[in-house]
Amino acid sequence: MKIVIDGNIGSGKTTQLGLLEQKGWTVRREPIDKWPLKEFYADPTRWAFLLHMIILRTLRPLKTTKPVIYERSLLSSRWVFWPVLKRQGHVTDVEHDTYDHFYEQFSWSPDIYIFLSKDLDLAWEHIQARGQAGDEGVTREYLGELDAEYKKLIKSVPCLVFMVNANQTVEKIHQDICKILVENELLFRDAHGSQVQKSSSRGREVPCTPFPHVCNLS
């Protein structure tokens, strides 16, 4: 079971992944320590193709039938970040064709896609305040271009898609994500054969995942 939490830069993915990890979920973060982000932002034409080839090899799903929450997926690499780079002239036609060839080999689709939708101004403020590695190369204009591509992507993601208002408080965003996970527990049972637990609060049966805290629907 592959659950992806996606969103523009500065949408709050890292914070939410941390909260879910604290509750017992297996979380797979973007391995940005393996990516030449600093070099890319300094010279995107030189590093765009290499960066995205590295992403293809490192942003891979775990070999498990248990639910895993992933920070982004190759979908955003191919259909959000890559189109912006191509439009800006940072990749050649040969690089584009080569990348597409390998993308077809390494691509994978999530079972559930949760998108954190955050206003650009708020995302920009968050980026400036947090000082995360690689943020120094992000501009407000670039953020806007990514936002436009994300709006196209979420219309064609090949799985269940859920939009979460990321302009809310951290706590409310977390509640909304947990609600999505609880309401889709039937998919988790199909993935790893979980037992079924009675729910007295709603008078129906729900599958109990390996994480007891998400079995409580009260």
What are these regions (language model features)?
Residues 124-200, 208-211, 215-218:
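NTP-dependent small-molecule kinase module
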Residues 47-107:
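Glycine-rich phosphate-binding loop used to anchor ATP phosphates in small-molecule kinases
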Residues 80-149:
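A glycine- and Lys/Arg-enriched "phosphate-lid" helix/loop adjacent to the NTP-binding pocket
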Residues 8:
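P-loop (Walker A) phosphate-binding loop of NTP-binding proteins
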Residues 13:
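Conserved lysine of the Walker
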Residues 21-61:
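Conserved substrate/cofactor phosphate-moiety recognition/catalytic segment
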Residues 16:
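Hydrophobic positions on the alpha1 helix immediately C-terminal to the Walker A/P-loop
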Residues 5:
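Hydrophobic anchor at the beta1->P-loop junction of P-loop NTPases
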